[in-house]
Amino acid sequence: MPKLSHYGKRGQVQMVDVSAKQVTTRTAKAHGFVRMKPRVVSSVRRLKNPKGNPLEVARIAGIAAAKRTAEWIPLCHPLPLTHIDVTARLCENGVELHSTVIATAQTGVEMEALVAVTAAALTVYDMCKALDKGMEIIGIHLVEKTGGKSGDFHREKPSQRLAPRGRKR
């Protein structure tokens, strides 16, 4: 059974020593969703938001946050990221968020991909909260990761439907 790598022999937390690990190309993808009322979706679609375009600002926030993941997550290694892509797509009941992060490093970029989607979701919420404080940030999860000793991971199916149809608010 795998063990938690952030615990030392005496149970103290520690940053994992990756100095002996191979430098390989690592990739990770994450998804998330901000559920909102139809009137908020309509406002975003028409770009009628007092703070500007939330989708573009969310993309930039996600990219900036991914680069600072080691400051968000105390035991993460600062990594030389070579590519970050964050997309924000408006759909009928909210905003779908996707991130892809790539690095050539000694440890993976899963946390960077998750932080990118999380920051993007929080930014959408911040920019639209004047219209609806009841928005929900849901379904943030790792979709896939490649590279490294633990091998590849591909999520078989989402744990929940991110954008359920017909839900009344």
List each model region and its residues.
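C-terminal binding/interaction regions
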Residues: 1-55, 60-77, 81-169
